Amino acid sequence: MKSFSNIDFSKLSLIDSIIATSQIIREDFPTKFVISDLYNKVKEAKFYISSEIEPNLKLKKLLKLFYKTWNFGAASGIYKLSDVLWIDNVLKTRQGTAVSLGILFLHIAQELKLPLNPVVFPTQLILRADWINKKKWLINPFNGEMLDQHTLEVWLKGNISPTAELYEHDLYKAESITVIRKMLDILKSALMEEKKMELALNVSNLLLQINPNDPYEIRDRGLIYANLECNHVALTDLIYFVEHCPEDPISEIIKVQIHAIEQKKMILH
């Protein structure tokens, strides 16, 4: 596994950061294919929007190309969540999630010098375009459609809390590292659900290099180790979580798991 510490996110674009982290997680990640396919898509998009002068019209045309002509969009039918997160797979199937589709569209738009940025909204990634006249567009990466304030408020109330309110900071531009962390969080959960524990462990270790002392991430790594029957290191991580988050209701469940692992160790010895 390559060293995560060698990645300088401040010098890499978002897409290059995602490619670099994907290479660390998956030995079979097809970097050459991804770079080549993205290069060709940027080239095609540049030609497709070249007839427009105004940036807002260029962006509208790019949305049409990405979601209608190329037919990128939300996954349908039966699928594994990790399959719609891996960038190489999304490029092949053209089916993704808000975060994977958003990262791809954002890369193409930024290569074409369009004023588009990521926003890590409480419910999903969205894209934000800021225009000279102070107007902004908020775009849903699932389908390329514009989002209004009412829709965002409905999302908050339906997914977070019936009393949740929309605040200005909910729509602030996100730094690349925040988007990467969001994607890795979702990917780790998907891989744990799919019982791909070795890959999930790689993701967890990446997240811990971003935020080394996060007790929740240490807890998740402990749960992954427990699944892999690496009981000694699992105990270290799970005990760390219980000690640092004693008030968290999950701590009681983790204590039961710690006891079960300790009992197993006693039986083995």
From Swiss-Prot:
Superkingdom of the source species: Bacteria
InterPro entries for the chain: SirB1_N (IPR032698)
Pfam family of the protein (one): TPR_9
Entry similarity comment: Belongs to the UPF0162 family.
Protein name: UPF0162 protein BUsg_167
